[in-house]
Amino acid sequence: MKTLVLGSTSPFRKTILEKLQLPFHCAKPNVDETEQKNESPQALVERLAIEKAKAVSSEYPNALIIGSDQVAVCEEEILGKPHNFDNAVVQLNKFSGKSITFYTGLCVYDSEKDKTIALVEPFIVHFNQLSQKDIANYLNAEQPYNCAGSFKSEGLGICLFSKLEGDDPNTLIGLPLIKLVGLLKQHGIDVLAEQSKLTV
């Protein structure tokens, strides 16, 4: 099997990829993540996923490199990180009783063949009606000030939601695993077939 590389230092993406039980390396991509003028959220995450995968190709010239990027959008506005309690309160008040769409760009890049396959996977989070007490209790417990949207869906943030809507819960955490299996197959890697080789 060709070397598999995750173009990310995110511990959450690493944990998700480990579910496939394939050996892989992690590499940090140096990419300018500034959005371009009039760029849609979907176009932004697809472009950045591709750029992140290609950014580590000089280190791994004969590999399949996975790139991923995610933004959260509410009422057509890309959500930033709150950085402090007061900003987080404003964000969560805005989300109360509403929904947020996460767009995750996913790319698998064959650095030997210069072949790129990419897609964008949406995932929708519906929020409960949140009281000021709910918001304060949550923020004091989890302090998600470095998280876009002011919550950690993989932690206590789940208490804020009324419903999750999407094809793959891994997408919400940053790596659409079902779609990744399909992209790897298009690049010639059958994840289940590789398991039999690994156990020999």
Curated annotation (Swiss-Prot):
What is the name of the protein in this document? 7-methyl-GTP pyrophosphatase
- Keyword set, alphabetical order: Cytoplasm, Hydrolase, Nucleotide metabolism
Q: EC number(s) of the enzyme?
A: 3.6.1.-
Which Pfam families does the UniProt entry name for this protein?
Answer: Maf
GO terms (molecular function) for this protein are: nucleoside triphosphate diphosphatase activity
Q: Where is this site: Important for substrate specificity?
A: F12, Q70, E154
Which residue positions are annotated as catalytic? D69
Compartments, as annotated in UniProt: Cytoplasm
Q: What is its main location?
A: cytoplasm
**Keyword Lyase found:** no
Which of the seven top EC classes does this enzyme belong to?
A: hydrolase
Reactions mediated catalytically? N(7)-methyl-GTP + H2O = N(7)-methyl-GMP + diphosphate + H(+)
Among HAMAP family, the record links this protein to:
Maf
| Job description of the protein | Nucleoside triphosphate pyrophosphatase that hydrolyzes 7-methyl-GTP (m(7)GTP). May have a dual role in cell division arrest and in preventing the incorporation of modified nucleotides into cellular nucleic acids.
Any one Gene Ontology BP term: nucleotide metabolic process
Cofactors (names): a divalent metal cation
